[in-house]
């Protein structure tokens, strides 16, 4: 992750935090409930951010509650939203006037579009193509069929899962800086 940190121009502290967020965002879909969908995974992803940014128990609990709301998007591209919300949480911790409700508003407004893009690319197209290749091998009893499917699918999905949280963080940080400078 240090190479990615350098590529995005992050200091070591922010780079380590974003590495945790990127790794944890892989598990966004691990606990899926019909009440809040991926909220548990989203909260799991944001816990290192909340713990780092806020000192008091009250602030941390408020942060946990803020991120344990309905969340449902494509798990491959959803990391962008976690990165963006990380930048917003960092700004909120620095600026007591920051409207923390905007963090949830941004998350909620991006869930649908990212689900549409991610599902179209990964679930409806790329998965079907790679599954077809894997199945064509497996139908003749070739053990490489499922392996080829997993390798091919993740050749595209894994870089997105790793890099998109950084992209979201960088874009969010840039936006927060511009907003702060413009007043």
Q: Where are the language model's segments positioned?
A:
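Extended aliphatic helical segments
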Residues: 21, 31, 49, 76-77, ...
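Glycine-centered flexibility motif
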Residues: 41, 80-83, 89, 112, ...
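Solvent-exposed, non-transmembrane amphipathic alpha-helical segments
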Residues: 42, 66, 80, 84-87, ...
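Short membrane-interface loop/juxtamembrane segments of multi-pass integral membrane proteins
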Residues: 89, 94-113, 175-183
